[in-house]
Amino acid sequence: MNRLSPDQDRPCTASARIAFAALADYLDPILASIATHDMTVMPDGDAYRVTAAFGQATLRALPGELLIQVQTRDRQALNRMKHALAGPVGFIAARERLHIEWTGDTGGLAPLADLRVVRVAAVQALTPHLRRIVFQGDDLAHLDRADQLHCRLIFAPTGDAAPVWPMLDDAGRVVWPGGKMATRVYTPVSY
């Protein structure tokens, strides 16, 4: 692995060769899932080209394995691209218990690009089991879209004025350097 220093932002590359005997059963759903996460998936010869605002990748189905090659503009985008691809692969093919190991550039822990800190602005009881909760925060425009059905909220421990938020590691996995916090999935009604 090529460890990059924090001040060494340059184009980065990495790849993963995943043993995947049942790839043919999962490839189409994996590609469809990737395409629903703000990435474009296009056939490119014997492979698929994935393009996102933060990088690009090639996915190639080989006999018994999936080869993923990524290229990004900097080290933070590298972990984000790994997460954006390994996440759907691991989720869609969860029963296969795939081992995804990356080689190439690494950049250390990187912040979650979509993480926003919000505060409760108001709470209104609608029924005994349903509440309307209004949140306030900065830079929330990315949530205001028709295809954004759910969001995950992370609850910092009560009284913790400086929580350590989750990060992305060199494998593109979400890690909790300060310990895992409670999370819930919510369905917003309006923004």
Q: Where do the protein language model's features map onto the residues?
A:
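Short amphipathic
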Residues: 12-19, 115-123, 132-136
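Short coil-to-beta-strand transition motifs
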Residues: 107-117, 176-185
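C-terminal structural segments of small proteins and small subunits
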Residues: 79-94
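Short Lys/Arg-enriched alpha/beta "domain-start" segment
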Residues: 1-42
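Long, contiguous binding/interaction regions
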Residues: 1-12, 26, 46, 52-64, ...
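Short beta-strand-to-loop capping motifs
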Residues: 16-22, 69-74, 137
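Ferredoxin-reductase
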Residues: 123-191
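A residue-level signal for conserved active-site and pocket-lining positions in enzyme catalytic cores
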Residues: 30, 68, 120, 148, ...
